[in-house]
């Protein structure tokens, strides 16, 4: 990577980005992106979330050069995709959701071929280094058709990195893979990020976004409905839950807690939901003890990204 003073502030920039797909006899035109304004900061791990059909793939494919925008501007690494499409495409690597590779090539041949497409000189190619990084060194000369689904997905990551792009987009990178491989891919994403690569991640696994991303945008029906640091987004759900496991089973919420949002859960625990800074946990515990009940264990639960996602998208559906 070059001196940071010469690098752009944003890895990806979209200003009033619009895409309308043509209609047909049986269907009207489809407005996939409705004036999207979005900035992905250089050096971040950025999560792009949204329901199916929200416009995530259209957004990514415009930057990848696979879809033509209807209007608006898009820049990759400070390069306008209209003014210098070749340089803009060279600044981004995209790992597609679909596994689509020639099964009669080996992983080594696949990466060499892709490096050739990007014009990477032979002496600058990192084919073996990339295979090592994604754990496929021992499959270097095997045919792609002999690889497992997880191995093929890792090879896709290596393919996207042959030209050392400063921006890497992973579209549902762990869809359909087991938990162990998911963790391995997460570790590799962190390693790439540590080397200076800006990561853009789309995923249906909200746990994945919460685990990896430091900034998250939620897109729904072609519009960005939230774009904030992860911690700020999580604070939108400004409630916590105090969960008390009583020593003896409880048939009902104690009268002493009548003024609280409390319930007995199926597992017998008492859950009290409260807002940050408005109610005292110590006071709740004191009132619980005043009822004569004894505490076996207690813990607090906070909203996770799934709660925020559902709340934001549900409110739009019901509006």
State where each predicted segment sits.
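ABC transporter nucleotide-binding domain
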Residues: 186-275
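Conserved catalytic motifs of ABC-family nucleotide-binding domains
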Residues: 164
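Conserved ABC transporter NBD signature motif
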Residues: 72-83, 88
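Walker A (P-loop) phosphate-binding loop of ABC-type ATPase nucleotide-binding domains
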Residues: 51-55
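Catalytic Walker B motif of ABC-type/P-loop ATPase nucleotide-binding domains
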Residues: 168-171
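Conserved ABC ATPase "signature" region
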Residues: 112, 116-139
